[in-house]
Amino acid sequence: MHGLLLAGLLALPMNVLAHPAEHHASNVLSRRGVDIDSFRLPLKAKYMDNEAAAEKIQALSFTKDDDYVSTATKLVKSTFPKSTFRVVDDHYIGTNGIGHVHFKQTAHGLDIDNSDFNVNIDRDGKVFSFGNSFFTGEIPKENPMVKRAFSDPVKALKGAVKALSLPVKSDNAKAKNVAGKETVEFMGTSGALSAPKAKLVYLQKDDGTLALTWRVETDVGENWLLSYVDANNSETVHNVVDYVASAEYKVFAWGLNDPTEGNPTSIRDPWTDASPYTWNSDGNTKYPTTRGNNAIAQDNPTGGSQYLNNYRPQSPNLIFSYPWSATATPPSSYKDFSITQLFYTTNRFHDLLYSFGFNEAAGNFQVNNGNKGGRGNDFAIVNAQDGSGTNNANFATPPDGQPGRMRMYNWTTARPNRDGCLEAGIVIHEYAHGLSNRLCGGPANSACLNALESGGMGEGWGDFYATAIRLKPRDTKNTNYSMGAWAANNPKGIRAYLYSTSLQTNPYMYTSVNSLREVHQIGTVWASMLYELMWALIEAHGNTYSANPVFRNGVPQDGRHLAMKLVMDGMALQPCNPNFVQARDAIIDADRALTNSANKCTIWKAFAKRGLGYGAKYDSRNRTGSNQLPPGC
């Protein structure tokens, strides 16, 4: 099958945008007078890197007959012999040969929802590294299921609606039991995009105790929330997780970052082996429009939740060639071009990430997984010119098996207004939220980047991939990049500092996080470190500037793609809701697994330059910086 796509920003350069660092995110909850950050989950995770894990497991007994799940289970049992837990059904073996197994702690048969254990098993069947946030306090003696010592879930729904000012009408709500212990779906409501749900779970609190809660799930479009409502006092909401990663971007793109960097060109059959059905088929149906196995792209001028019957360009011969002009106005006048561009960028990034290991088993976004593992029926729903907002974009990442949802907005920062779909960097940044949320904590758990610091890293990963993809052959380590300059109509972009290896141009250090209270600010610090890492690896291995990496024994042969691969592998190794130190250690472990630590000192030097060296320590209020290198470097 042949397809001809006319894409305005086709070589895929990348930038990610958000409002200036001094501005706080203005998501829908905050516009309703609710500070979502005040409900974030606390950081609880610990991470045992490869070196520490090797010492820890010497006393443990494993047999050659153990498969990687059994080995991981033995480790959890030996570490917490008095705890009960279950194996989460999302384990898989990554392309680097590391097996990833995830566990959820339980009490009285109920999940402790923020108590997770992840174990990474190497090619030889040995424990490679692990992390956990298991609860170590006293489990309540009484089983709440015996005396039914908890409130009606309808009260919990109403409590969440009231406390968070949700646009959900729940006066006539009724709870209907569905599969799972104390799991319900609410009938008779309106205002949410799908029927709200609730599940009875325990929650670790900051004071070291457990709270019995109803985990109320409400998808209201701009926010897709898990609200932990106290099961005995429905007016108390302990914590909130938001599946939607939102930013005040001012936009981005691949090879070409935005319309200032080139002109639209026609590209024939751009898919790779990552898309065996091509981009316009799911293996069962061939679509003469911007729909396929990986994504479905359409306009959404009303900002509504429906998408299947929305407008898409049609082309029976699969030639998607449409006019565009920088002076055209309004953006709806070139919606065919915009939808095609969004479809192209989303699919192109899907294929690149697949080559790094974000495949079916790892929880990627596809309808048809071709019997390769994971849960299917979850392509990315990507809306162009979405009318639910302006000067923004967001991506909702539910667990594997449910579609991701991207909303791309128009920008009123210039005349004529600009369309965020034409900056691939924004699209890439948003899709990267799907990547990090599916990998961190496992494909079945989308709540592992909701603490302030881990959420900040989620923003930073988006910036990193957007910037790495937009590099040009003329670039050197002295090249600086802004974020969202085109969409923001501001040459300085939307971050507090340019991404730069110069400490004069970008002075952010690890200890800078001590004074930052917003995820995009923290994300800029993390992305600044990853920018250092990328250039350090480019200096060591060169840069092909090719659109696709060249692998040898599974290792990208240039520094830019190697950095992207190691950063992604680190996401799958680190614990649920990691901090900077743990994420750094996971990247170092990723290099050990992939290259036998060939880049260990290069990686350490990059992080140490910005204060995340060997002696750096995490404390939520007083992080300690270090420029030290470990022995041997």
UniProtKB/Swiss-Prot annotation:
Active site: 430
Entry note: cofactor: Binds 1 zinc ion per subunit.
Keyword Transmembrane: no
Chain positions recorded as Zn(2+) binding sites: 429, 433
Organism: Arthroderma gypseum (strain ATCC MYA-4604 / CBS 118893) (Microsporum gypseum)
The protein, known as: Extracellular metalloproteinase 3
Principal location listed in the UniProt entry: secreted
Locations listed in the record: Secreted
Keywords for this protein: Glycoprotein, Hydrolase, Metal-binding, Metalloprotease, Protease, Secreted, Signal, Zinc, Zymogen
